[in-house]
Amino acid sequence: MDAVVKLFKEQAETEAQRQMPVHRPVDAPRPSRAEAEAAVRTLLAYIGEDPHREGLQETPARVIRSYDEIYGGYALSPDDVLDRTFGEIGSFDDFVLLKDIPFTSHCEHHMVPFMGKAHVAYFPVERVVGLSKIARLVDLYARRLQTQEHLTSQITTALDEALKPRGVAVMIEAEHMCMSMRGILKPGVTTLTSQFTGAFRDDPAEQVRFITMLRGLR
């Protein structure tokens, strides 16, 4: 029986290693799942809880499993999402806009959520990407510890490098729980960030048209 348990643990650890994020500092070894669960127990004790009481006995394992999902963006790169493009764009010469892409991310300062919507547009030159891929790209970066500014920049850069379009426009609107549920306690405040490249950056009229389409379609 002990041999079976040992084998199961080894398999579990192997599976955990397979999930190792690809974007980690090379000098930062990843703690084991058991070590991560122990850290959760420490935090439970720190806030004044008894991590051994019945209702919390499975909490460390649940928290770490949820982290595998919430922070799953570390295990992917933009190339995994934008690996397939299409060249059949015909005579289309305007920009493609996806608006109101919902997302939830976590603030890197307090590890509490911020959530909102991303609006993404690009001017294709020779190739386009599937619409779902843009939403997946937003999720990829949102499922990491973030600042809203960095999230905006990462989405913009990834599309710019993968598609080589005439321009990219990204706007994000979000509410940050670090303002709503702690600190200044101001729920309902919306933070807006934007970044433009190419035609969107160089031609203010295109920026106006981008924003007009966002507001006009609500």
Swiss-Prot record:
This protein's pathway: Cofactor biosynthesis; 7,8-dihydroneopterin triphosphate biosynthesis; 7,8-dihydroneopterin triphosphate from GTP: step 1/1
GO MF terms held by the record: GTP binding; GTP cyclohydrolase I activity; zinc ion binding
E.C. numbers: 3.5.4.16
Annotated keywords: GTP-binding, Hydrolase, Metal-binding, Nucleotide-binding, One-carbon metabolism, Zinc
Reactions catalysed: GTP + H2O = 7,8-dihydroneopterin 3'-triphosphate + formate + H(+)
One GO term of the biological process aspect: one-carbon metabolic process
Family: Belongs to the GTP cyclohydrolase I family.
Name of this chain's protein: GTP cyclohydrolase 1
